[in-house]
Amino acid sequence: MADPLPFYIDETDPPAKREILRASLTLFAERGLAATSIRDIAEESGYTNPALYRHFPGKDELALHLFEICHARLWRVCADALASQKGFSAKLDAYVAAWLGLYDDEPAVLAFLSDSARVLWPRANATVRRNTMIGLARELVAEAPRVRARSGAVDRDAAAASIQGTLAELGRMIQVGAVAGPARRWRTKLVTLFEGLVA
């Protein structure tokens, strides 16, 4: 039985396009956009430069294609996690679990999104720019008891940035070996930390 296709590859994609997408994501995650050339992608994929140009006008369009698909997947998984639960504590746990699970299951995707957002975000389609991770974090924080009480003790934007930033930075710390993975092992500690921040 063949391995399942990564989510960023469509089952209708021809073999060359599949390998080009796989190779591109790997290289973009490992080296970054600027340090990855068309020649690198061709070499890694086993296909020629002209094969790449049959599927994408250039490296920038290929990178943007991957960025939009990967961001949409990340956002959908985390949005579904929030929607699946009732109440702040359950939503927080589901959101953290979804994010950490994605990091463990798709580390190259999260590395690519993090490293390339500054360059690709402004060029992304309107749906991607509307469906932000910080927007999901704000939605989550809006459910927190201290935020709902409107006491002013917790700033919603600062709390959302703290949650999203901590999740992203933990992934980076695991990536560079500053802390041990898997990411899922941090779930309870992070939920406790975030509850202390806003609950």
PLM region descriptions:
Residues E30-A34, Q85, E106, V147:
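Short coil/turn segments at alpha/beta junctions that flank glycine-rich nucleotide-binding fingerprints
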Residues A72-W75, P122-V147, D157-A161, R184, ...:
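Amphipathic alpha-helical packing segments from all-alpha helical-bundle domains
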Residues L5-Y8, P15, E19, A23, ...:
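Helix-turn-helix
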